[in-house]
Amino acid sequence: MAAGRVSVDGVSHALPEPFFVIATQNSLDQVGTSPLPEAQLDRFLMRLSLGFPDRASERALLCAGFDPSPDSPSGLSPETLQQLQDRCTNQHCSELLIDYVLDLVEVSRARHPGLSPRASQGLLAAARAWSLLQGRDHVVIDDVQAVLPAVVEHRLDAGCPARHGSPHSEALLQAVPALR
């Protein structure tokens, strides 16, 4: 899907722009659930835990009801989302920052399985988006560090149940000095 196309029964279809997938994974301790192979886990940009809403938010959710209508209001128009995605792509990354990402990935590869080129691309893309959300037009090392756990933990924990905390990210951050 990252190529902007899907195939169904041997027929290739172009995906609309903007396009992205949000997927959920059941807990591995549930019946009929098995871990995803490393190659499939690597295709997911991030693993996030949304947790539960606070009481007031859940009350608002219950009182509002559920409107499955495709005409329900959304937070962003497709055009606005596309503009934001384009702006993320244009966030400036210095050579020093790219070297920092490469250093993190290289250190991860000292142990199996290590981070793939897809992971390094995802890390930089997520850092670009984070920097935009922080109101900057360029990416700084703090942006990479902020998104690192969400981007790498599921890749380095391949086949293991989700853990609390970010042991792999913390180890990478300790092993790679952040030049400022």
Feature names for model-found ranges:
Residues 1-76, 82-91, 128-130:
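Canonical AAA+ ATPase core
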Residues 5, 52, 70, 109-110, ...:
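Secondary-structure transition/hinge residues
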Residues 52, 91-95, 135-138, 159:
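Residues at alpha-helix boundaries and short interhelical turns
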Residues 55, 59-63, 98, 102, ...:
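An amphipathic alpha-helix signature
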Residues 61, 84-87, 104, 147, ...:
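Residues that form generic nucleotide/phosphate-binding pockets
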Residues 72-123:
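Conserved AAA+ ATPase small/helical "lid" subdomain
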Residues 110-180:
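C-terminal engagement/docking regions of AAA+ P-loop ATPases
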